């Protein structure tokens, strides 16, 4: 078994069904090996499309999408797709071919330092230097991409490594990484603070972002909102966290959001941001968002907490687990008057349209 065969075997172990890509010399050993696999390869017109298509599949399935491209221009062409996946927290495995190991750094034909180029917008990147490391690296890559705050991982594999004989293929059953241990369970002290603030609040609201969908926490969010009568708005990435016909859902906030959703968030006295970047598209003036309200920020990525605005109660953890813990608590709160006000906004704050009669047959 050569390195290219080992790569395909790793993908099969991870139950990968599709690989998007465009062949080139430095990735040809991999494409030759995958011909004998049940994995379907999907040829794209440009490498950027491979990253976007793999990212799109990941958005639909929740599992890491995979793309494979050649070195040099093939690798640099996927950068936009990788950056998009990083910004949207989408699990993506990008496999890039590379020139012979002994030629690295010599500026040979179609050599590019792709691991250095993508450093700022991948969760991690690998340059494979030993063919026997392939099983471990792929196991780690899939684990990193699909846990914590999900995102892209790049694996750069020189052509000589793809053609080298592997001594023994053993795919690891588990990952052991001392430096990577994302927080899943939220701190119960902080969770109880959230419950305490809900009991004090008269006008609470939840703003759900894409992190709720990525953690598969829609059911828990709906149960929590319905149990305590808390209205919910979403960012653009959070669309789908609740059915649009749910009376507790008030639509998308932000520049292109619903006017009544923005007003609801502005007038709230307790704002619970869950899995959402406090970015300009959702909040045009982040420095003003905490005026006259308490901000609770829940995110699986500790780096996102307080990134754009200070939170009174920061809570690091997976949204699904945090909502489950909150549902187990007894919270004494009632917000019917607030919901009635928001229903009035929803009925009255609608755009006035004057259709042109000439468009009607």
Positions of PLM-derived features:
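Phosphate/pyrophosphate-binding active-site segments
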Residues: 132, 292-361
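Active-site-proximal loop->helix
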Residues: 33-35, 56, 99-121, 244-249, ...
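Cofactor-/ligand-binding subdomain signature composed of acidic, glycine-rich
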Residues: 1-14, 133-201, 325-336, 344-348
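Active-site diphosphate/adenylate-binding microenvironment
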Residues: 4-8, 17, 25, 30-35, ...
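Anionic-ligand anchoring segments at beta-strand to alpha-helix junctions in alpha/beta enzyme folds, i.e.
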Residues: 17-55, 186-187, 193-271
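Short acidic-hydrophobic, aromatic-tinged amphipathic segments that line or gate anion-handling sites
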Residues: 44, 125-130, 250-254, 313-323
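Structural signature of the thiamine diphosphate
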Residues: 17-18, 59-70, 75-96, 119-172, ...
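Glycine-rich beta-alpha junction loops
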Residues: 26, 99-100, 157-163, 210-212, ...
């Amino acid at each position: 078994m050569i390195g290219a065969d080992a790569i395909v075997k790793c993908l099969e172990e991870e139950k990968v069904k599709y690989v998007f890509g465009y062949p080139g010399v430095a990735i040809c050993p991999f494409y030759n090996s995958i011909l004998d696999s049940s994995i379907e390869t999907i040829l794209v017109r440009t490498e950027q499309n491979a990253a976007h298509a793999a990212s799109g599949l990941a958005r639909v399935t929740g599992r890491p999408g995979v793309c494979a491209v050649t070195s040099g221009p093939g690798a640099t062409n996927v950068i936009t797709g990788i950056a998009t996946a990083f910004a949207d927290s989408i699990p993506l495995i990008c496999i890039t071919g590379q020139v012979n190991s002994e030629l690295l750094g010599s500026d040979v034909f179609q050599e590019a330092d792709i691991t250095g180029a993508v450093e700022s917008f991948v969760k991690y990147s690998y340059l494979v230097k030993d063919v026997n490391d392939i099983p471990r690296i792929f196991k780690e890559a899939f684990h990193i991409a699909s846990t914590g705050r999900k995102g892209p991982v790049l694996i750069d594999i020189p052509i000589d490594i793809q053609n080298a004989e592997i001594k023994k293929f053993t795919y690891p059953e588990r990952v052991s990484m001392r430096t990577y241990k994302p927080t899943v369970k939220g701190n119960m002290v902080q969770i109880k603070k959230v419950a305490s603030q809900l009991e004090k609040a008269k006008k609470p609201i939840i703003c759900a972002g894409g992190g709720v969908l990525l953690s598969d926490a829609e059911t828990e969010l709906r149960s929590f909102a319905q149990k305590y009568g808390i209205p919910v708005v979403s960012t653009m990435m959070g669309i789908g966290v609740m059915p649009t016909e749910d009376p507790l859902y008030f639509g998308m906030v932000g520049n292109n959001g619903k006017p009544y959703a923005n007003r609801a968030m502005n007038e709230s006295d307790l704002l619970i941001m869950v899995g959402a970047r406090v970015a300009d598209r959702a909040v045009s003036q982040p420095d003003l968002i905490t005026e006259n309200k308490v901000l609770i920020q829940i995110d699986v990525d500790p780096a996102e907490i307080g990134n754009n605005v200070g939170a009174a109660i920061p809570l690091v953890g997976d949204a699904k687990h945090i909502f489950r813990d909150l549902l187990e608590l007894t919270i004494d709160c009632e917000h019917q008057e607030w919901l009635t006000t928001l229903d009035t906004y929803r009925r009255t704050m609608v755009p006035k349209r004057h259709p042109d009669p000439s468009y009607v047959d």
